């Protein structure tokens, strides 16, 4: 967050005293803001109107979205500032707890986008999380906005005294938060059960306050309000024909409970403001047209309330204290000097290890951005469900920092599904364990089934930091993948089962979080099984050899998103050398290198430049030849068709973002320098071409890509074109 947001002009104690002296001459004004999820944006025009009219507010109570808006307002943010903050949010970014991809260690980065579902293993059994989201990004967001308010803050000491409503899952009772971390309080009041994980608060386990008190009128009255202004976003009940989904039915049920609760309270409200929320939902964050409508309806409600507010101001002689006129904000300037760091909640990971990784030491200058950056580094290790911090006054004007952690179990199960029009449906399940049974040990297992069969298990020791420069590794794998073999004119000669069992060991090198190199010795037992007899296969390549080889792989990955990149670089390289001196039954060498560059211009225009180079020498079996026959590498050819001893690819894609989730795509590619030494394949020296267009939709299930391309029919007839359609949806593995 910009440092200017965090500056303060007057201390909260002085301003509270000024406000109290002014309020003694008139009735105290209490503002009540209801919950409503996305509909909470409608509160902002009301806050802006209060600022415009210099209408005093002496205490605030809020629930859920109302508590967030009210809490920021109570802390000293103006209505205009809150509008600027909220309008600048990308709500889709909050759908994942993952920190920016650049902070992830390479071992987690390479799994990004590979699965849709994840389950923690507790006592060896998969378990669902406490919420679909842990809410880490929400906590970071609130902490940055409210830095450096102390963790033992008395909410009455804010520029405007404040109450935040939540519900304790343990007792089933309403929890009125009056003291503690304001950032944690705001995170607690929005914790919709099963959607956002509950928040631990002393002995309480807190969730969304709207379950019991969505319009906390009684709280401002208890704080001494003589005039109550309430903003209710509940809206009318939906008609029968509008209750067509489980979400609508659940929302209606909760709405009925809330309406009953509000009936008794409304008689104590002096001014009730009800923006029109008909047809709008608390989950409309991701629909720009509906969010704009919520804002417009809030502005209309503010216009309608102007006369009533002016009448109240004149009737009671209301005026605002200097606090709001000066724009004072609770806390202090952005940067502080760190006094001490304490860590709570660590069970299996030592506090000293966490402190060393966190990296901030007594005497270091700290601000919200720096602390959040270090927390993201820790969170990216995937050892913690959430990490929260609080500040407390220290000696000599310094601040003491307390990290509160909630650890994840050491193992997890990840599940991914994908579909393409060659392999059809493929499912993948990955079992991953860290620090078990040895601290720093990483065990990765994955099995694929249905359209193709694969199994892979790997043990490595990158240490707990996941960034030790050198680590040992051992692995084993099995594959049984249907693969096509093509003639030069594009006809399918046969389909064979590419079966192999492998074992390997070697060393890995972590050069940076985005750069990795692995060197391994591998033994691979092949068992190629053609579905139809084809004599040239056996005459040129052994079908059941034992290969003993050296493999070197390298990856540089700076992509911002693996599933749908907008910016960044992905470079991959492979060297494979199979030598008779190692006891291999086939002697050959091959090398491949590829590079992907993504760049987005003017927000909606993304260019992708892809290049590939592959070469081989020696007696390379046909099933080991470089293969780029897939739509992500080359459009216009069929799956597995672009395979040869040597070739190069140049490709350019352009994507136009129509919405946040839909892109139109154009693509063109050319394969050059094609050399195929198989006697059964004829080819004409020249280039293979492909031009295509498609659409990509970033669904909740994964990226859906539908492409149609015209491309060369085959290596023997590169100028004869045919159309190829491809469909891919789901995880990327």
Q: What is the meaning of each model-derived region?
A:
Residues 1-10:
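Bacterial N-terminal signal peptides that target proteins for export
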Residues 13-22:
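Hydrophobic h-region of N-terminal signal peptides that target proteins for export
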Residues 22-63, 71-376, 380-385, 392, ...:
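Patatin-like phospholipase
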Residues 166-168, 178, 275, 343-347, ...:
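Flexible glycine-/small-residue-rich
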Residues 236, 420, 450-452, 477-483, ...:
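Structural signature of outer-membrane beta-barrel domains
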Residues 368-369, 373-374, 386-552, 627-632, ...:
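Gram-negative/organellar outer-membrane beta-barrel architecture
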Residues 412-415, 539-543, 547-677, 681-682, ...:
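C-terminal outer-membrane beta-barrel translocator/porin domains of Gram-negative envelope proteins
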């Amino acid at each position: 967050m910009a440092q200017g947001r965090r500056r303060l002009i007057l201390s909260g104690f002085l301003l509270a005293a000024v406000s109290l002296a002014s309020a003694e001459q008139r009735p105290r004004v209490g503002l009540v803001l209801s919950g409503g999820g996305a509909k909470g944006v409608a509160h902002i025009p009301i806050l802006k109107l209060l600022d415009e009219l210099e209408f005093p507010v002496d205490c605030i109570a809020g629930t859920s979205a109302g508590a967030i808006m009210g809490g920021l307002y109570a802390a000293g943010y103006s209505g205009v500032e809150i509008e600027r903050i909220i309008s600048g949010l990308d709500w889709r970014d909050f759908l994942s707890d993952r920190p920016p991809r650049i902070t992830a260690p390479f071992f987690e980065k390479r799994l990004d986008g590979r699965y849709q579902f994840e389950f923690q293993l507790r006592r060896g059994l998969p378990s669902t999380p406490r919420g679909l989201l842990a809410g880490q990004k929400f906590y970071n967001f609130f902490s940055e906005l409210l830095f450096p308010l102390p963790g033992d803050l008395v909410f009455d000491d804010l520029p405007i005294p404040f109450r935040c409503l939540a519900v304790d899952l343990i007792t089933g009772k309403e929890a009125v938060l009056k003291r503690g971390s304001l950032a944690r309080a705001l995170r607690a009041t929005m914790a919709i059960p099963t959607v956002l994980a509950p928040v631990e608060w002393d002995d309480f386990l807190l969730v969304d306050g709207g379950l019991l008190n969505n319009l906390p009128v009684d709280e401002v009255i208890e704080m001494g309000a003589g005039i109550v202004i309430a903003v209710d976003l509940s809206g009318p009940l939906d008609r029968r024909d509008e209750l067509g989904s489980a979400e609508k039915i659940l929302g209606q049920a909760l709405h009925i409970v809330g309406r009953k609760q509000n009936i008794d309270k409304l008689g104590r409200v002096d001014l009730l403001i009800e923006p029109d929320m008909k047809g709008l939902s608390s989950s409309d964050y991701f629909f720009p047209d509906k969010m704009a409508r919520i804002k417009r309806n809030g502005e209309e409600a503010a216009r309608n309330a102007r006369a009533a507010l002016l009448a109240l101001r004149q009737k009671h002689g209301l005026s605002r204290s200097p606090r709001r006129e000066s724009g004072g904000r609770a806390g202090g300037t952005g940067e502080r000097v760190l006094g001490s760091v304490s860590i709570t909640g660590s069970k299996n990971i030592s506090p000293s290890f966490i402190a060393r990784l966190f990296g901030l030491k007594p005497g270091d200058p700290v601000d919200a951005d720096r602390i959040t950056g270090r927390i993201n580094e820790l969170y990216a290790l995937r050892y913690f469900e959430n990490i929260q911090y609080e500040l407390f006054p220290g000696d000599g004007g310094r601040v003491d920092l307390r990290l509160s952690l909630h650890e994840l179990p050491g193992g997890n199960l990840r599940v991914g599904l994908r579909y393409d029009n060659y392999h059809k449906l493929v499912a993948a399940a990955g079992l991953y364990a860290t620090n078990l049974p040895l601290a720093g040990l990483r065990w990765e297992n994955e099995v694929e089934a249905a359209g193709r069969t694969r199994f892979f298990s790997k043990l490595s020791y990158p240490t707990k930091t996941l960034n030790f420069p050198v680590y040992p590794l051992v692995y084993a794998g099995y594959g049984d993948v249907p693969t096509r073999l093509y003639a030069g004119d594009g006809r399918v000669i046969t389909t064979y089962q590419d079966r192999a069992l492998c074992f390997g060991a070697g060393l890995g090198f972590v050069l940076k979080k985005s750069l990795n190199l692995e060197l391994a010795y591998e033994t691979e037992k092949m068992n190629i099984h053609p579905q139809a007899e084809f004599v040239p296969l056996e005459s040129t390549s052994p079908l059941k050899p034992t290969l003993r080889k050296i493999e070197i792989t390298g990856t540089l990955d700076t992509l911002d998103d693996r599933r749908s990149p907008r910016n960044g670089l992905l470079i991959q390289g492979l060297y494979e050398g199979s030598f008779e001196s190692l006891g291999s039954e086939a002697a050959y060498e091959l090398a491949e290198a590829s590079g992907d560059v993504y760049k987005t211009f003017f927000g909606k225009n993304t260019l992708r430049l892809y290049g590939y180079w592959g070469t081989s020498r020696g007696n390379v079996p046909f099933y080991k030849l470089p293969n780029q026959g897939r739509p992500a590498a080359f459009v216009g050819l069929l799956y597995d068709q672009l395979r040869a001893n040597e070739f190069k690819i140049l490709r350019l894609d352009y994507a136009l973002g129509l919405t946040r989730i839909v892109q139109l795509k154009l693509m063109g590619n050319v394969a050059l320098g094609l050399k195929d030494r198989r006697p059964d394949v004829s080819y004409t020296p020249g280039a293979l071409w492909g031009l295509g267009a498609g659409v990509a939709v970033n669904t909740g299930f994964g990226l859906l890509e539908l492409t149609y391309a015209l491309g060369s029919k085959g290596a023997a007839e590169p100028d004869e074109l045919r159309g190829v359609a491809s469909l891919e949806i789901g995880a990327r593995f």
